[in-house]
C-alpha cells in the first residue's frame, strides 16, 4: 500500500518520520492528518512513537534504523532515549552514535540486510552500524552524491534512487544490495527520494504532491500491491492452517 500525506505543509515525509518493519517514529506537533495516515495503515501492527531527537523534529534525518535497531546521534537527550527505550519493542537495540556527520539519516541508507553509507563516515560508526543493525556495510555514492540516505529509499523488496543514476550504477548498486532498483522521483519531480518518503516491506508514505505515475512506480518497485504486515499475514496463515488441518 502507498499513501500520501503532509507534515504541516511539508511534503518531506522522510524528514519527519522513520518507518521500519518493527516500529515507526513520527515527529511531535504535526497535524492529525499526518498521524492518521500512518495509523490507518499500520493499525496495531507496530508501535507508532511520537518523539523528538536532539530537541528537533527532523527525526527522519537524524536517525537510521531497521527492524533490529535504531541509531541516534550523540546529541539525543537522556529523556528522549528513555522514551524510545520505553516505547520500542524490546528486541530493538537503541544506540547513541558519536559521529561528526550527525544527521545519520542523510548519510546512512539501510534495510534489514545491507547499508549504504557516506564514504567519509567514521570507522567506529561503520562497526556500530554493522553490530546494532546487523547489516553488511558498503561505502558508496549515488549518482555522485555522498548523501546516500537522502538520495535512496530502500526496503527488503526494492529501492528507489536519484533520478539521474546511470543504468550501470543502478546495476552495480542492485547487485550489492540484492534488491531491484529503479531511478525515480517523489513529490512531483523531487530527486531527494530518501527525504521525500518512508517505506517498509508493506507500506510507503510519500508527500501529498506525489503524482499518480510516481506512486505507481513506488508501488511496483517496493512490491506493495498486495503486501501486508507480517503479523497480520502470520495470523492469517495460522488461521488457514487451523481451518484446513
From Swiss-Prot:
It is found in: Cytoplasm; Nucleus, Nucleolus. SMART domains: eIF6. GO terms for molecular function: ribosomal large subunit binding; translation initiation factor activity. This is Eukaryotic translation initiation factor 6. Its main location: cytoplasm. It comes from Saccharomyces cerevisiae (strain ATCC 204508 / S288c) (Baker's yeast). One of its GO terms (cellular component) is cytoplasm. Present with 18600 molecules/cell in log phase SD medium. GO terms for biological process: assembly of large subunit precursor of preribosome; cytosolic ribosome assembly; maturation of 5.8S rRNA; maturation of 5.8S rRNA from tricistronic rRNA transcript (SSU-rRNA, 5.8S rRNA, LSU-rRNA); maturation of LSU-rRNA; maturation of LSU-rRNA from tricistronic rRNA transcript (SSU-rRNA, 5.8S rRNA, LSU-rRNA); ribosomal large subunit biogenesis; ribosomal subunit export from nucleus. It holds the Pfam family eIF-6. InterPro entries: eIF6. Coiled coil: none annotated. The modification Phosphoserine is found at residues 174-175, 231. Binds to the 60S ribosomal subunit and prevents its association with the 40S ribosomal subunit to form the 80S initiation complex in the cytoplasm. Is also involved in ribosome biogenesis. Associates with pre-60S subunits in the nucleus and is involved in its nuclear export. Cytoplasmic release of TIF6 from 60S subunits and nuclear relocalization is promoted by the GTPase RIA1/EFL1 and by SDO1. Also required for pre-rRNA processing. The lineage of its organism: Eukaryota, Fungi, Dikarya, Ascomycota, Saccharomycotina. Keywords: Cytoplasm, Initiation factor, Nucleus, Phosphoprotein, Protein biosynthesis, Ribosome biogenesis. The gene is TIF6. Phosphorylation at Ser-174 and Ser-175 promotes nuclear export. Belongs to the eIF-6 family. Monomer. Associates with the 60S ribosomal subunit.
